[in-house]
Curated annotation (Swiss-Prot):
Protein name per Swiss-Prot or TrEMBL: ATP synthase gamma chain
Organism of provenance: Stutzerimonas stutzeri (strain A1501)
Similarity remark: Belongs to the ATPase gamma chain family.
A GO molecular-function annotation: ATP binding
Pfam hit, one: ATP-synt
Lineage: Bacteria, Pseudomonadati, Pseudomonadota, Gammaproteobacteria, Pseudomonadales
Gene from which this protein is expressed: atpG
Length: 288
């Protein structure tokens, strides 16, 4: 019964792992709901400031802030939002594939690349893959603060403002629903015009700007970029927990199937051992 004992030991080990993955699935469900609440709470601000920026830009068509000016691209920057922890399926890998594909397209045009990496997994990936990481931050926790991001984002904004970076992208995972997380690459700078926005007619906008719209535009553009990065971090957190929940559920289900298969093998081995013992007893009795 040596084989049966080994199988029994494997079954016990897998059951122990199954309990862990099942517990992690339940924890991920709870954290995902909290992350969804944070995402929903921050979204109205991000959308509203986008509208305000659009209206300010429309109110001053002759004024072009440096963040809104197109120029020849010699160096691009990426703000990459990854996770701090693993065990979330292919969430990070799928994101890195989208990023590397875009980086390669720029490299083929002899354009240099700078990276600002948010999340430990991104930092670890680019340490082995290679890349000019000019800013990095990790260990943001379950409730990230926009104040934690300002320093790293400022490095990239200063680079664009001073002409070291000619285009800036934000790379993160969008939370579509519990089953779907989509890696996306959006251009942050220069600020592209919102083609879907309708022109504002006089009397339809309920704000008065003091001292004037131009000065507000200068101040709000930085806040706008920071809010977009923060929204991406919060949304990426919800996507992470959803992906982890799915990964742990799949692991738990696979463990159950493996236990069933091993249980069948164990029963067959035990049956074969009992049959052999009976045959030996019958053979011994016949010899006597």
């Amino acid at each position: 019964m040596a084989g049966a004992k080994e199988i029994r030991s494997k079954i016990a080990s897998i059951k122990s792992t199954q309990k862990i993955t099942s517990a992690m699935e339940k924890v991920a469900v709870s954290k995902m709901r909290k992350a969804q609440m944070r995402m929903a709470a921050s979204r109205p601000y991000a959308e509203r400031i986008r509208q305000v920026i659009g209206h300010l830009a429309y109110a001053n068509p002759e004024y072009r802030h440096p963040f809104m000016v197109e120029r020849p691209v010699k160096r691009v920057g990426y703000i990459v939002v990854s996770t701090d922890r693993g065990l979330c399926g292919g969430l990070n890998i799928n994101l890195f594939k989208v990023l590397i594909k875009n980086m390669k397209e720029w490299h083929d045009q002899k354009v240099e690349v700078d990276l600002c990496v948010i999340g430990n997994k991104g930092a670890s990936f680019f340490r082995s893959f290679g890349g000019n990481v000019v800013a990095a931050i990790g260990n943001l926790g379950e409730e990230p603060s926009i104040n934690d991001l300002i320093g790293s984002v400022k490095v990239m904004l200063d680079g664009f403002h001073e002409g070291r970076i000619d285009r800036l992208y934000l790379v993160s995972n969008k939370f579509i629903n519990t089953m779907t997380q989509k890696p996306t690459l959006d251009q942050l700078l220069p600020l592209a015009a919102d083609d879907s926005a309708e022109p504002v007619k006089k009397g339809q906008w309920d704000y008065l700007y003091e001292p004037d719209a131009q000065q507000l535009l200068d101040a709000l553009l930085v806040r706008f970029i920071e809010s977009q990065v923060y929204q991406a971090v919060v949304e990426n957190g919800a996507a992470e927990q959803a992906a982890r929940m799915i990964a742990m559920k799949n692991a738990t289900d696979n463990a159950g199937e493996l236990i069933s298969d091993l249980q069948l093998v164990y029963n067959k081995a035990r049956q074969a051992a009992i049959t052999q013992e009976i045959s030996e007893i019958v053979g011994g009795a016949a010899a006597v």
